[in-house]
UniProtKB/Swiss-Prot annotation:
Enzyme superclass (EC): isomerase
Organism of derivation: Neisseria meningitidis serogroup A / serotype 4A (strain DSM 15465 / Z2491)
Any one GO biological process: UDP-N-acetylglucosamine biosynthetic process
Pfam family, one: PGM_PMM_II
Highest taxon of source: Bacteria
InterPro entries: A-D-PHexomutase_a/b/a-I (IPR005844), A-D-PHexomutase_a/b/a-I/II/III (IPR016055), A-D-PHexomutase_a/b/a-II (IPR005845), A-D-PHexomutase_a/b/a-III (IPR005846), A-D-PHexomutase_C (IPR005843), A-D-PHexomutase_C_sf (IPR036900), Alpha-D-phosphohexomutase_SF (IPR005841), GlmM_bact (IPR006352)
Its job: Catalyzes the conversion of glucosamine-6-phosphate to glucosamine-1-phosphate.
Keyword line: Isomerase, Magnesium, Metal-binding, Phosphoprotein
Protein name per Swiss-Prot or TrEMBL: Phosphoglucosamine mutase
Length: 444
């Protein structure tokens, strides 16, 4: 059954436009609360709610709290905390569920609601459908004796900081390294610099002055120019960029070169292979560069592709019992460290890997050069038959690139666009193919 409200990563949209309105989020909290009460009959469920730094987070948090407590669910509020921190605390505190209020890398004018089940794992499709089925039902507030309570907890940041630090090798530290940390004026501003500082690094913190409106604005993992300039200015060894909710990572070396998720996954996997750690293999996506796949196999590391989206990478990792996976966008999963993507922990694993290999980022990543990719986003209207419109041109381009490249077309799960990606050994082949396919789709 198709989902009505949940996308690939929860419920997301522009604030003030359906479904990111106070009245809908109230109903969403109430519906989710009803499902929790039905599934947790032994005791009153408790939900953890975290958020990033968007101004709308206050409004949406209040609506969620009202919905959950009206359904008879207790609520624990952390304030600003990265998404992986919410997942961790949901598990560590043995709570019934966790909720993150964030639109990740989007502008402040967007927001979203992401749920975690007991244990800090993402909700199953079945539970999301159960919640959706109850959203349109009439709200019936529990009797006063059964209402939930809401409270804020102190020390959430500190618990998450200690957890992140525990994933770094106990016999080592970061002394001697100068790092620039860009937290995108987002959820990680209060925790990320402390993690690296407490492990011994000299830290320069930027993107750490959120005002409710500047999250992801010319900073963070989706805009690395600010970090690149800061690394050069401060003569730092590396720069680390998170996105607004702290689950993505990009890194910059001392020369200002940017390393995306693919490169960082390769570094981690190569070091684990060198140490003789059996990671099973690496899960990438249909967007992962072909050159990386070849380089991993040369290191004796198996590789497979999942659909785009960290939830699909996670599904493949769980099915195969593999440990490492992720996307070029900076979502990186190290399953032996955390059960969800975590920008801070991923950066620690990269730095630990570089110590293991006794090399810098540039040297390790020189093992492979990405095939040139051209990515074009084509806006579409709901119901447009873009697959039919692009069928003939797609067949032509795929035939031309056989053995020399590949094509990936996919509809975004969060916005009305089709992403056209063409990868080839030569940049002009990729650019020409992508433009032809995008033109065919755009002609609708």
């Amino acid at each position: 059954m198709a989902k009505k409200y949940f996308g690939t990563d929860g419920v997301r949209g522009e604030v003030g436009q359906f479904p990111i309105t106070p009245d809908f989020v109230l109903k969403l909290g109430y519906a989710a609360g009803q499902v929790l009460v039905q599934h947790d009959t032994d005791q009153k469920p408790t939900v953890l709610i975290g958020k990033d730094t968007r101004i709308s987070g206050y409004m949406l948090e209040a609506a969620l709290v009202a919905g959950f407590t009206a359904a008879g669910v207790n609520v624990v509020q952390t304030g600003p905390l990265p998404t992986p921190g919410v997942a961790y605390l949901t598990r560590a505190l043995r709570l019934s569920a966790g909720v993150m209020i964030s639109a990740s890398h989007n502008a402040y004018s967007d927001n979203g609601i992401k749920f975690f089940a007991e244990g800090g794992v993402k909700l199953s499709d079945e539970i999301e459908l159960e919640i959706e089925a109850k959203i349109d039902e009439e709200m019936k507030t529990q009797p006063s004796a059964r209402l939930g309570r809401a409270r804020r907890i102190s020390g959430a940041d500190d618990r998450y900081i200690e957890f992140c630090k525990s994933t770094f090798p106990s016999h080592s530290d970061l002394r001697g390294l100068k790092l620039v940390i860009d937290t995108a004026n987002g959820a990680g501003y209060g925790v990320a610099p402390k993690v690296f500082h407490e492990l011994g690094a000299q830290v320069v913190s930027i993107g750490d002055e959120p005002n409710g409106y500047n999250i992801n604005e010319k900073c963070g993992a989706t805009y690395t120019k600010t970090l690149q300039a800061a690394v050069l200015q401060h003569e730092a060894d590396y720069g680390i960029a998170l996105d607004g909710d702290g689950d993505r990572l990009m890194m910059v070396d001392k020369n200002g070169k940017v390393y995306d998720g693919d490169s960082l996954i390769y570094v981690i996997a190569k070091a684990r292979a060198r140490e003789g750690i059996n990671i099973g293999g690496v899960v990438g996506t249909v967007m992962t560069n072909m050159a990386m796949e070849i380089a991993l196999k040369e290191q004796g590391v198996d590789f497979c592709r999942a659909k785009v989206g960290d939830r699909y990478v996670l599904e493949q990792l769980n099915q195969r019992s593999w440990l490492i996976g992720g996307e070029a966008s900076g979502h990186i999963l190290c399953m032996d460290k955390h059960n969800t993507g975590d920008g801070i922990i991923s950066a620690l694993q990269v730095l630990a890997a570089l110590q293991t290999l006794n090399q810098d980022l540039a040297t390790v990543c020189a093992d492979w050069q990405p095939y040139p990719q051209t990515m074009i986003n084509v806006r579409i209207q709901k119901g447009q038959k873009w697959q039919e419109a692009s069928k003939d041109v797609l067949a032509e381009v795929e035939k031309e690139l056989e053995g020399k490249g590949r094509v990936v077309l996919r509809a975004s799960g969060t916005e009305p666009v089709v992403r056209v990606m063409v990868e080839a050994r030569q940049a002009d082949w990729a650019r020409d193919g992508a433009e032809r396919i995008a033109s065919a789709i755009g002609s609708l």
